[in-house]
From Swiss-Prot:
Official protein name in the record: DNA-directed RNA polymerase subunit beta''
Gene Ontology biological process terms from the UniProt entry: DNA-templated transcription
Function: DNA-dependent RNA polymerase catalyzes the transcription of DNA into RNA using the four ribonucleoside triphosphates as substrates.
Subunit structure: In plastids the minimal PEP RNA polymerase catalytic core is composed of four subunits: alpha, beta, beta', and beta''. When a (nuclear-encoded) sigma factor is associated with the core the holoenzyme is formed, which can initiate transcription.
Catalytic function, reaction form: RNA(n) + a ribonucleoside 5'-triphosphate = RNA(n+1) + diphosphate
Gene: rpoC2
Length: 1445
């Protein structure tokens, strides 16, 4: 018993941490027994006081803070405002999520802070208040969920759910809040079901891998240890660091402070020594660890340290520390997701401090030193380029301050600020580690994509629809329901009005005839989907004049059959054209690979099918030299290839063979070395032999001249030119023999004749005599071929040639060009292609390629068809419902019995407008031109003078200036007498644009145009009717601007009045307004038909009534985007919906609904401009930064990932400290003979420590504290194996075999030839399946495989582990009462006794000691005698140490 003067007296409130320290001091001073007695007295005292106080807890004791109501209301108002800004396009999804999370987190934390003052003011003796804030039970976070609000919850993946739980458990949760609560709660339904099973399986694996680890010896005599730097992490408290890391450990080396020994080796570290270390600030301490224990199958006392159950004492011999370690790590697995929802997992930035103004005033600074940006919440801000001087001026005061560089200014120059207003956010000096994360934004409406000029129109990758956004801008989705037309025949044209339930496009059109039937199916390219079926007698070219239907002329390549081939190497399908000519015996067979774009659109000189000519390929690189062959370059698109230096795809030109002849590849050997300083062993312009060493691992395949050239990216090109060197005697005519080809039999310099083709090259090396280098040449002969003359032509009715498909042969390399061979694949030199050809002055611009299946006599074949898209000579008068087919016939066909199949047809159920979107494969992605006729301009008033204004932009009022499409009018000066109209033979007006029915006829209104108008929200029935009768969207009946004119055409006083005409009383003229839509580059584009159309458009439109009172407002233009909540006039309400103006009327506007989306710089768009996207499609990928943390894989999955040694994508967070440790350790081994071995060992040791720290970090981040010794035991087993490297049959090991590290070291001491191995990190599952006990392995996993493998190898299980003995019913070799442990204790005591006697007594004889590396003579039993003795009964055991049997 200690004296009373030394007892400690506490006169303060004791929390949980103080209780732990108090119990630790009691154990250290008085021992476990007396400490337990004191704690029993404290327990009794506590129960007595609780009984006297009669404290109880009821539901009425849960008092909610009265401020919760207005706090929740304020947060909801902020969330509603944020949602509106997101709908307006002011913030994107990530900024919205950040603000939402921080708003609700701040609300939850403020409510938590209000909880304690509320209890103190209203009910200080409240049981909940006393319990939680006294530290006895519960915490503020748990009570906050009872009386405050639950707040934000994370899902099982660690992502925060943006819908907060506003209720608490006292108020009760709604159904939605309960389901969300189940995800992140400690005992939630979802969490319990998943985490319990995972944690149990993790515990089983951990116990399996360390079950045999038992404390067997007192000291393993190791001199190794791990170094702990107490000053490494300055953020942690030094006292907490030393308490967790050092207390209970054993020093691995003497500890010196200023040449004074503070502690000796093998001394345990207690609290007194810790206080000295803290006072002296010892930087580096080496301690013993289970990671450095020399014992192979067990562990020693000193490497383990203190027992965690007996404070201050070393662990006892026989204690199964392995099972304790496995259970200690696995059991808290169910707690790893406990406290996630308490903090809400808030997005935090790297803002260190805020700068606020001291008083009211005006702020001034230099605007040239800042540039604009957006905060992480989407608010406008300015970044300081350098340190910025800011001045705040008021009437009587001036305050100057300096804003550091890279800080955010939240105010503008000359802005009035109030006192304590936040004006800047200063970034932290050391920015935390961040990672870039991608977030996909999905489209929530169906419609058409449009974007601003801030988007790169070219795709990010080749053949991709991903576009990059340079700066912050908007995307617009114009609403509409899409319909993908599987056929090219549309019965309606762009902007046609459709009645309710009107038939749009059928799937089949059947024409029946009684004669020979040939079934033709039109196939979609690449997909081969049936689209149309036609029955007819003969196949030919021409025009269907009978039914006045408009069809396009076509060519069918009947000599080329289309077949589908599957390439197994590439895993792709290819369409091939098989060419067959002549009889079966003399048949010409050739295959062409189709090279047609997905759209099927081809241009002039396009090569749409390619065939490799056999016999014109080479396997080695070289240069091409032309002989007698003559070529011409082919204009048009070339073949893409990747440059070896720049890695950029470029177009390779083609060279058509116009005269046959020969050409010659000159072979050479090429090596590309990509190292910065390659060890090249040959000199430039030197001669080498075959198999000469070029580098350390490259030998030359041929002998010849070496040419070395430095290329881009620090690479070198080494060429070996095969050939011979000839030094001529006379150099006069040498220039004539340079760069020439010598045929066989011709003399060279009148000295010798050539047997084959040779290539002569004059070489002038530096500091040496010039010479002629004679190189071999390979001859390729290109003969004349008759099949090249065969062509397919399309002629008009006047036998004029319109289109021609011909076959050409071309070379891929020009004279003198180098041929590069990559990946040891052959290079084709000559190809044959099918090319389109028409005259340059022809009106044909493009043609369309498709597949046609023709079936005759039960045999079906596919052919390629080339169709004209548009040609003037085939234009005829178009009636309603014109059919646009791909088939063409010239003779008359009897259509006496034809019918339309309406099955599975598409009907329009609403009144709407057909809107053809732009083709996604076109280069110009823009809005179409809405001009259905050829127009001439006349003036609105007969008395007005001729006036030709210039093109002028309309005023706009949209705040989003980046997303405006300007509406303009092109006005040309015409003489009214020059107005003409084209007519055909019957005198009918020709409609050159494909416009079918419901053409809009607007009557000329001579009333004065009202210039000024403004919006109104009034809607009446007449305006809605007028909207339905509008017809062609984009037409306006009168225009507000003097620079816009209605364009109308004179039809020789024969007006075409439509039934939807607005004014039918004036029939003297025919008026058609003309409007242009412009893209962001302010260019107009032609109307482009596409397979995708949008209909039911008016269903997603709304009208805004206009009134023409005085007081001008902002002018609006056609095609202009307007945002929601924008007011055109200050007198009237704001616009209720965002959209695009698609029609203007004097009394109202028609706005097509649209959804704006904000995208920041660096984001990508996943659709082409004008493409139709559906609801749920990926719209944008936003790229943003967030703090690197364990939010992605957190808790139990993170621990499992580390323990299973699974590779992770991200690098270590603490890279800087890791490099410092590596630098400190590796500098010792550099320059040493065994440096590479020491470096591998040091790297493995550092990896062990890093793995322990990462596992510990996951547990500590969620409030679970585990001793490092437990984790080190597991990591020791994960790193205890090594992998043999080479054939070790001589030493008994196979390559790739896993053996114990200590066993490999002992074998290397004995064997003459050392075993080469490398360290390896195994996961706990794999480590459990690679132990010395096959019984333990078979009981864990893969029982059949393990037992079969053990039987084949003849393995022996020595039953050294605990699990093996339990399986066979034996006594486990663990526990302090185990006989083997008792013997071990006796042996340890006798070793100490004999060691002391050794100093005074010498012994004779030499006996090998199996327990030590030194030669000692000891008379005590060996381990073999111990195991034999333990098998006997206890009564027969003689404990006499001198007894020998």
């Amino acid at each position: 018993m200690a004296e009373s003067a030394k007892l400690l007296f506490y006169n303060k409130v004791i929390d949980g941490t103080a209780i732990k320290q108090f119990i630790g001091r009691l154990v250290a001073h008085f021992g476990i027994t007396y400490t337990a007695h004191i704690l029993d007295q404290l327990k009794t005292l506590g129960f007595q006081q609780a009984t006297y106080a009669a404290t109880s807890l009821g539901i009425d004791d849960l008092l909610t803070a009265p401020s919760k109501g207005w706090l929740i209301q304020d947060a909801e108002h902020h969330s509603y405002t944020l949602e509106k800004h997101h709908r307006y396009g002011n913030v994107h999804a990530v900024e919205k999520l950040r603000q939402l999370i921080e708003t609700w987190y701040a609300t939850s934390e403020y409510l938590k802070q209000e909880m304690n003052p509320n209890f103190r003011m209203t009910d200080p003796l409240n049981p909940v208040h006393m319990m939680s804030f006294s530290g006895a039970r519960g915490s503020a976070s748990q009570v906050h969920q009872l009386v405050g609000m639950r707040g934000l919850v994370s899902d099982p993946q660690g992502q925060i759910i943006d819908l907060p739980i506003k209720s608490n458990f006292r108020e009760g949760l709604s159904l939605t809040e309960y389901i969300i609560s189940c995800y992140g709660a400690r005992k939630g339904v979802v969490d319990t079901a998943v985490r319990t099973s995972d944690a149990g399986y993790l515990t089983r694996r951990l116990v399996e891998v360390v079950q045999h680890i038992v404390v067997r010896k007192t000291d393993c005599n190791t001199f190794r240890g791990i170094s702990l730097n107490s000053t490494e992490d300055k953020k942690k408290n030094l006292q907490i660091f030393t308490q967790q890391k050092l207390v209970g450990r054993v020093l691995a080396d003497n500890l010196y402070i200023n040449a004074r020994c503070l502690a000796i080796r093998n001394q345990d570290i207690n609290t007194n020594l810790i206080e000295k270390l803290i006072t002296l600030k010892t930087p580096l301490i080496s301690i013993r660890s289970p990671l450095t224990c020399k014992s192979m199958l067990w562990i020693c006392q000193l490497c383990y340290g203190w027992s965690l159950t007996h404070y201050g004492d070393l662990v006892e011999l026989g204690e199964a520390v392995g099972i304790i370690a496995g259970q200690s790590i696995g059991e808290p697995g169910t707690q790893l997701t406990l406290r996630t929802f308490h903090t809400g997992g808030v997005f935090t930035g790297d803002i260190a401090e805020h700068v606020r103004t001291p008083f009211n005033g005006t702020i001034e600074f230099d605007t040239d030193l800042v540039y604009p940006t957006r905060t992480r919440h989407g608010h406008p801000a300015w970044v300081c380029r350098t340190d910025l001087a800011v001045t705040i001026k008021s009437q009587n005061k001036i305050h100057n301050l300096i804003i550091p560089s890279q800080s955010l200014l939240l105010i503008q120059n000359n802005q009035y600020v109030e006192s304590k207003q936040l004006i800047a956010e200063v970034h932290a000096k050391v920015s935390p580690f961040k990672e870039k994360v991608q977030k996909y934004i999905y489209c929530n409406i169906e419609g058409e994509m449009h974007w601003s000029k801030r988007v790169r129109h070219a795709s990010k990758y080749l053949h991709s629809n991903v576009h990059l956004i340079f700066n912050t801008g908007h995307l617009w989705i114009l609403s509409g329901s899409s319909h993908e037309d599987k056929t090219s025949s549309m019965f309606f044209k762009n902007q046609d009005q459709i009645n309710t339930k009107f038939f749009i496009s059928p799937r089949k059109i059947l024409f029946m005839k009684k004669t020979n039937q040939v079934n033709s199916k039109n196939l979609d390219p690449y997909l081969e989907k049936e689209m149309e079926t036609l029955n007819y007698s003969n196949l030919y070219l021409g025009i269907l004049n009978k039914s006045r239907n408009f069809v396009y002329p076509s060519i069918i390549l009947h000599d080329y059959e289309v077949k589908r081939i599957y390439d197994e190497k590439k895993g792709e399908n290819f369409l091939l054209l098989e060419e067959r000519h002549g009889e079966k015996k003399t048949q010409i067979f050739r295959r062409f690979v189709l090279n047609i774009p997905k759209s099927g659109i081809l241009e002039n000189k396009d090569i749409f099918a390619i065939s490799n000519d056999p016999g014109y390929g080479i396997q080695s690189p070289g240069i091409i030299k032309y002989g007698t062959i003559k070529v011409n370059p082919i204009k048009g698109k070339g073949e893409t290839f990747k440059n070896r230096e720049t890695k950029i795809l470029r177009l390779r030109p083609r060279y058509q063979v116009i005269e046959p002849g020969n050409f010659f590849p000159i072979p050479e050997e090429v090596h590309i070395l990509y190292e910065s300083f390659p060890p090249i062993l040959v000199r430039n312009d030197s001669l080498i032999k075959k198999n000469t060493q070029i580098t350390s691992d490259i030998r030359s395949q041929v002998g010849g001249l070496v040419r070395i050239r430095r290329k881009m990216n620090d690479s070198y090109e080494v060429k070996v030119l095969p050939g011979r060197v000839y030094h001529p005697e006379e150099r006069r005519n040498i220039s004539k023999q340079n760069d020439i080809l010598v045929p066989p039999g011709e003399e060279i310099s009148n000295k010798f004749q050539s047997e084959n083709w040779l290539y002569l090259e004059w070489i002038t090396p530096p500091k040496e005599k010039p010479f002629i280098f004679i190189r071999p040449a390979i001859e390729f002969i290109v003969p004349e071929e008759t099949d090249l003359a065969e062509t397919f032509t399309l002629n008009s009715q006047k036998k004029q040639e319109i289109l021609k498909v011909k076959k050409i042969r071309y070379l891929l390399y020009e004279d003198g060009e180098e041929v590069e061979v990559t990946n040891k694949t052959g290079i084709q030199l000559i190809q044959t292609g099918l090319v389109l050809d028409w005259k340059e002055d022809s009106s044909i611009k493009k043609v369309y390629a498709s597949l046609t299946e023709i079936e005759t006599n039960g045999l079906s074949k596919k052919f390629l068809q080339i169709s004209l898209i548009e040609h003037p000579i085939f234009e005829i008068e178009k009636k309603k419902n014109n059919v646009n087919l791909k088939y063409l016939f010239t003779n008359e066909i009897n259509y006496s019995s034809h019918s339309f199949n309406y099955e599975n047809g598409l009907f329009n159920g609403y009144r709407g407008i057909i809107r053809i979107s732009s083709n996604e494969n076109q280069e110009d992605k823009s809005l179409p031109i809405l001009s259905p006729f050829d127009f001439v301009q006349i003036f609105l008033s007969k008395n007005s003078e001729e006036y030709t204004p210039e093109m002028k932009d309309e005023g706009n009022f949209n705040l989003d200036t980046n997303s405006i499409f300007y509406a303009k009018s092109f006005v040309k000066k015409f003489n009214q007498n020059s107005i003409t109209s084209s007519q055909n033979s019957s005198g009918t007006f020709i409609n050159k644009e494909f416009y079918n029915h419901n053409n809009i006829n607007q009557e000329f209104n001579s009333r004065k145009i009202i210039r000024n108008f403004f919006l109104s929200i009034e809607r009446n029935f007449m305006e809605i009717l007028l909207l339905r009768k509008l017809g062609l969207l984009g037409n306006s009946h009168s225009l507000p601007s003097p620079f816009q004119f209605s364009c109308w055409a004179n039809t020789h006083n024969q007006p075409i009045i439509n039934r939807y005409s607005i004014l039918e009383n004036l029939r003297d003229v025919f008026q058609v307004p003309k409007w242009y839509f412009f893209d962001e580059n302010k260019k107009t584009h032609k109307l482009d038909l596409s397979k995708n159309s949008i209909y039911h458009l008016l269903t997603w439109s709304f009208s805004i009534a206009l009134s023409y009172e005085e007081g001008a407002i902002h002018l609006v233009g056609l095609g202009q985007f307007i945002c929601e909540n924008i007011s055109i006039s200050s007198k009237y309400q704001t616009i209720s919906e965002s959209g695009q103006i698609i029609a203007i009327h004097p009394e109202f506007l028609v706005v097509r609904l649209a959804k704006p989306s904000l995208a920041t710089g660096g984001a990508t768009i996943h659709s082409h401009y004008g493409q139709i996207i559906k609801k749920g499609d990926v719209l944008i990928t936003l790229v943003y930064e967030r703090l690197k943390s364990g939010d992605i894989i957190q808790g139990l999955p993170k621990v499992e990932q580390l323990l299973e040694a699974r590779p992770i994508n991200s690098t270590s967070i603490n890279l800087e400290n890791g490099f410092e440790n590596w630098n400190r350790d590796m500098t010792k081994s550099l320059g040493s003979l065994w440096g590479f071995l020491l470096s591998a060992k040091t790297t493995m040791n550092q990896s062990q420590i890093n793995l322990v720290d990462q596992i510990q970090e996951v547990y500590q981040s969620q409030g679970v504290y585990i001793s490092d010794k437990h984790i080190e035991i597991v990591v020791r087993q994960m790193t205890s194996k090594v992998l043999t490297l080479e054939d070790g049959m001589a030493n008994g090991f196979l390559p790739g075999e896993l053996i114990e590290s200590s066993r490999a070291q002992r074998m290397n001491r004995v064997l003459e030839e050392s075993v080469l191995y490398k360290p390896i990190l195994l996961g706990i599952t794999k480590a459990s399946l690679n132990t010395q006990s096959f019984i333990s392995e078979a009981s864990f996993q893969e029982t059949t495989r393990v037992l079969a493998k053990a039987a084949l190898r003849g393995r022996i299980d020595w039953l050294k582990g605990l699990k093996e003995n339990v399986i066979f019913g034996g006594v486990i070799s663990a526990g302090t009462g185990c006989q083997e442990v008792v013997w071990q204790v006796i042996l340890e005591k006798r070793k100490e006794t004999y060691s002391k006697r050794k100093k005074n007594k010498l012994f004779s004889g030499r006996v090998r000691d199996v327990f030590s590396y030194y030669q000692r003579i000891l008379f005590f039993p060996t381990m073999k005698i111990i195991h034999k003795t333990l098998k006997k009964p206890l009564s027969e055991i003689n404990l006499d140490p001198n007894y020998r049997k």
